[in-house]
A protein has these predicted regions:
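Ser/Thr-rich, Pro/Gly/Ala-heavy low-complexity intrinsically disordered linkers and tails
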Residues: 1-50, 126
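Short amphipathic alpha-helical surface micro-motifs
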Residues: 80-85, 127, 276-279
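Extracellular/secretory pathway and lumenal proteins
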Residues: 53-55, 72, 118, 125, ...
Length: 373
């Protein structure tokens, strides 16, 4: 499941679309907690919620059959789903997005707290990977749903399902031209949408990013969701809302939210936040490419970016020799690979369109760097 338009602004069009979707998900009435028949704020938790098939031949072929949406109007999320937004979203070729979480009745989200559980949680300073402070462990049966919209029209809905303790599955649904329902795709697909080509990922491509090393669900973390959301019953901090709904197994430690790449943080903070959401999925210890660590919490010297020679494998790709040259984005492979759309592009999966705001942010940051630490 990919993120939304990045430096263009989590609080801009993507956030507005998510808030619009929230009014659908939050429209039902109720007052009981998560273990009751309805959740406060209009969320209903007594129903089965999203379907998580245990066998692939049991998979619903239409989005309207998944339980994640209103079957009579699949453009509306089911009342069992809770909408959310993130502080630092992933660039998804300019698409606006709606985001939701579905939990099976009676289950809770476990938020990693390294002070409370040092045996199973490692902080970044101690080399933590998927066990990072503030990571959300979603229970078996949980589903993360994201809806991608181009020009206000639904193009794709992705479901990431936690099937067993060790198994996750990703599903891509293609919306019909009428916008009335979406069909499960058996494989990847490239489709013209407006003036761009939209890529629907295969199931294996979904899991190429949603790895154990990256924490599987990716977006739902304390630092990403520590922000207000415009729910149907009023604006509220998302962590407080999830707590009020009884969705956590204990009150999570409050961690500062990531800076918005288009927000008021320093240039370095905003650039590092962008790299965290757009690059650190793979570039972190234990993930796909572990010789760099681009997580926000890591000190700049430990990212292995500045004045670091590219790998021997990259050397065959006709790239700039250095990952990051202080003051010179044009001679930095980090910038180069964000600007191209050829086979050397980063990220390799999930984006065919250069992010104009994101590339400018990273170029401005590289230009501002005077020396390596």
């Amino acid at each position: 499941v990919s993120g939304a338009s990045a430096a263009a602004g989590a609080s801009g069009s993507a956030g507005a679309s998510a808030a619009a979707g929230a009014s659908a998900a939050a429209g039902a009435s109720g007052s009981a907690g998560a273990s009751g028949s309805a959740g406060s704020g209009g969320f209903v938790f007594s129903g089965p919620g999203c379907v998580v098939p245990t066998k692939e031949d049991d998979e619903p072929t239409l989005l309207s059959q998944t339980g994640c949406v209103d079957p009579s109007d699949p453009t509306k999320a089911a009342a069992t789903l809770v909408p959310y937004d993130v502080n630092s979203p992933l660039w998804s070729d300019g698409a606006a997005k709606e985001r939701y979480i579905s939990l099976p009745p009676g289950t809770k989200i476990h938020v990693k707290d390294c002070m409370v559980e040092p045996a199973t949680c490692k902080s970044v300073d101690d080399g933590g990977t998927a066990e990072d402070e503030g990571h959300w462990d979603l229970p078996v049966g949980a589903v993360v749903m994201k809806v991608f919209l181009i020009g206000g029209a639904r193009v794709e809905t992705r479901l990431l399902s936690h099937v067993t303790d060790t198994t996750w599955r990703g599903y891509s649904f293609e919306w019909n031209d009428a916008g009335t329902d979406a069909t499960l795709l058996p494989d990847q697909l490239d489709k013209p949408v407006g003036d761009q080509t939209w890529h629907f990922p295969s199931r294996s491509q979904c899991l190429a990013c949603h790895t154990d090393g990256a924490g599987r669900s990716l977006g739902p973390t304390t630092a990403q969701l520590n922000r207000d959301y415009a729910y149907a019953d009023g604006s509220m901090n998302q962590l407080d809302k999830f707590q009020a709904l009884g969705l956590f197994d204990r009150t999570p430690a409050r961690i500062a939210g990531y800076p918005s790449p288009s927000g008021d943080g320093t240039l370095e903070e905003r650039a590092r936040s962008y790299l965290h959401s757009n690059c650190a999925i793979c570039h972190r210890p234990g993930a796909t490419v572990s010789d760099m660590d681009l997580r926000f919490e890591v000190g700049f010297a430990d990212t292995l970016l500045c004045n670091q020679v590219i790998t021997a494998m990259e050397d065959n790709l006709d790239l700039p020799r250095m990952r990051l040259v202080p003051g010179d984005p044009t001679d930095s492979s980090l910038s180069y690979r964000m600007h191209v759309t050829s086979g050397t592009r980063m990220p390799k999966i999930g984006s065919n369109v250069v992010d104009p705001d994101g590339t400018k942010l990273i170029d401005d940051w590289i230009t501002s760097i005077t020396s390596c630490p």
